[in-house]
Amino acid sequence: MKWVTVVLSFALVCCQYSLWFGKGSIGRNSSLREQIAVQEEKNQTLALRNHSLAAEVYDLENGQEAISEIARVELGYIQDGETFYRLIRHNR
């Protein structure tokens, strides 16, 4: 009977060791959950960026307004018959 108790105690210690310090331990599981949360947040940010870029590509492919806006902002494009006004703020 004493021998069975020793064997069962040893098996329990082995199971507890793998639970607390092994490859699939509780600490590692917690660390992986934190990494997953961080990665999901990054993925969500990138998905929003991708959606925005896809909408911009669609506008560039299907409409002239996006092209005109980019030309105005980045290149200073002014169409015929338009008047350009530049407003300058004075910091006082």
Curated annotation (Swiss-Prot):
It comes from Neisseria meningitidis serogroup B (strain ATCC BAA-335 / MC58). Residues 28-50 form a coiled coil. Belongs to the FtsB family. The keyword GTP-binding does not apply. Residues 1-3 are cytoplasmic. This is Cell division protein FtsB. The chain crosses the membrane at residues 4-21. It is found in: Cell inner membrane. Part of a complex composed of FtsB, FtsL and FtsQ. Essential cell division protein. May link together the upstream cell division proteins, which are predominantly cytoplasmic, with the downstream cell division proteins, which are predominantly periplasmic. One of its GO terms (biological process) is FtsZ-dependent cytokinesis. It is a single-pass type II membrane protein. Residues 22-92 are periplasmic. Keywords: Cell cycle, Cell division, Cell inner membrane, Cell membrane, Coiled coil, Membrane, Transmembrane, Transmembrane helix. It holds the Pfam family DivIC. GO terms for cellular component: cell division site; cell septum; plasma membrane.
